[in-house]
Amino acid sequence: MIAAQAKLVYHLNKYYNEKCQSRKAAISKTIREVCKVVSDVLKEVEVQEPRFISSLNEMDNRFEGLEVISPTEFEVVLYLNQMGVFNFVDDGSLPGCAVLKLSDGRKRSMSLWVEFITASGYLSARKIRSRFQTLVAQAVDKCSYRDVVKMVADTSEVKLRIRDRYVVQITPAFKCTGIWPRSAAHWPLPHIPWPGPNRVAEVKAEGFNLLSKECYSLNGKQSSAESDAWVLQFAEAENRLLLGGCRKKCLSLLKTLRDRHLELPGQPLNNYHMKTLVSYECEKHPRESDWDENCLGDRLNGILLQLISCLQCRRCPHYFLPNLDLFQGKPHSALENAAKQTWRLAREILTNPKSLEKL
């Protein structure tokens, strides 16, 4: 048994050093190329409208606010200033969303975003995004990369297509630090010893973002309340949870396997599903020794089996907001197909670790 485990870990490490590292290097190169174009567009936006200041800064070889959705798809979060005159309200009526309401006694004129406040006193995510979209469209025509970049049509999101190869979504957002949403108040679960109190304090201090992007309720149509609402995002908090042991290596393996074998019709799976399942695996295996290098095969296998279970149940709860289903809106046939593909992949890796050389 131990020999089989060691064999699997050996082949996974080989796969990591060859396939995962080359994937990372290729994506880093793409990010540099994409960020040059996005920075140029945002510079033009800032000239037209100084309230939208580019926050796409490079720190320690990574760009703040940039998320990799897939090797050809990225999201850049543009942090806005001056949320202060608004109260953050998440009453659970819109899973995964919250609203920003003008604080009592505060005048609209005190806000930097006065014309985007609704009659009821809410700061409208949709109105801000609509204005931003107009500015980006104008900036694309003026910027020095105008020959290689164009807006993606037929969406209220702000998306750029670069060199006909890459898609970048630019999402206006507010950074919320020092508060924690009520809809995530159950976390951490009291009966689970992971993460420890120090890590919990770090994660909560990291806070979350409020993104201006489309959020749909179960019927798939956006109500006016939803279009004014902001989407909760915990990217930095989630990254902090995955520090230590082989957690990040495990996620890197899953992302690479997804890119190579689970990029399927209907796009049922993305990197964020993988990240979410690694967090759940950490709860199931709370001891640091469970994440030693020699447990890499067991952890990867456990996550793939959990993924199959989620696909078969057609439900993948968000880690911090379990009422939010990350498979919502995905075609059932696409989820079934993904379950079959994941099962084939898991069986192949477990029964014949050497097959990783060809995967």
UniProtKB/Swiss-Prot annotation:
An individual GO BP term: cornea development in camera-type eye
Binding site for a ribonucleoside 5'-triphosphate: R23, K24, F63, E64, G65, L66, K248, S252, L253, L254, K255
Pfam families documented for this protein: Mab-21, Mab-21_C
Binding site for Mg(2+): E73, E75
Molecular function GO labels: metal ion binding; nucleotide binding; nucleotidyltransferase activity
Taxonomic source organism: Danio rerio (Zebrafish)
Protein purpose: Putative nucleotidyltransferase required for several aspects of embryonic development including normal development of the eye. It is unclear whether it displays nucleotidyltransferase activity in vivo. Binds single-stranded RNA (ssRNA).
Keyword annotations from UniProtKB, A to Z: Developmental protein, Magnesium, Metal-binding, Nucleotide-binding, Nucleotidyltransferase, Nucleus, Transferase
Localization terms from the record: Nucleus
Subunit comment: Monomer. Homodecamer; composed of 2 back to back homopentamers. The protein may exist as monomer in solution and oiligomerizes upon ligand binding.
Broad EC category: transferase
GO cellular component: nucleus
Name this protein carries in UniProt: Putative nucleotidyltransferase MAB21L1
InterPro entries the UniProt entry points to: Mab-21-like_nuc_Trfase, Mab-21_HhH/H2TH-like, MAB21L/cGLR
Enzyme Commission designation: 2.7.7.-
Family: Belongs to the mab-21 family.
Keyword Magnesium: yes
Keyword Nucleus part of the UniProt annotation: yes
